[in-house]
Amino acid sequence: MAKKTLYIFNPEHDLALASGETNYMPPASARRMASELALLPVWYAERGSAVLASSAYNLDYLKRMQELLDIPVYLMTEPELASEPALDIRPWGWDAALRKRLSGLGVDESLLPSMQQISVWREDSHRSKSVSLLPELQLNEHFCGESYYLKTPEEWKSFVEEREGCL
């Protein structure tokens, strides 16, 4: 059986990934953005794929856009997830909270990344990685920038005091 591709717009992802909590509750502004822009993936989703929305609230908008433009995707609501045995899930980003949410909605565990994999992604997304990566990206004299990862108030104070015009 061919897997159906499902796109999910979860703009709270970076915050959820940073927290690492399975029960993460994003701020109201992020929840509102996720709700209002749930159909954002229709603009880049592959032909014949689905876009997740919490309810059919967005269906009228999608139908109107499909009348005007060639948008060959369909809406899938959260209650429909449990009845889909084969999904290729493509969120904005994976985190423990999204994994728990989808599992709670009945998505088969085999379709979700493991907590171990999410932990690896979380570690690879940490700011400390960008500090070591930035020098590797400076390929010639036209590339610039420095990155620091400071963890303690003492480090912050020392950093500011050692630089003229900092802040």
Q: What function would you assign to each model-found segment?
A:
Residues 1-5, 85-88:
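A short, charged/proline- and glycine-enriched loop
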Residues 2-43, 47:
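N-terminal-proximal low-complexity accessory segments that begin disordered
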Residues 30-44, 52-164:
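Conserved N-proximal alpha/beta basic substrate-recognition cap immediately N-terminal to
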Residues 167:
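Conserved, well-structured core segments that form the ligand-binding/active-site neighborhood
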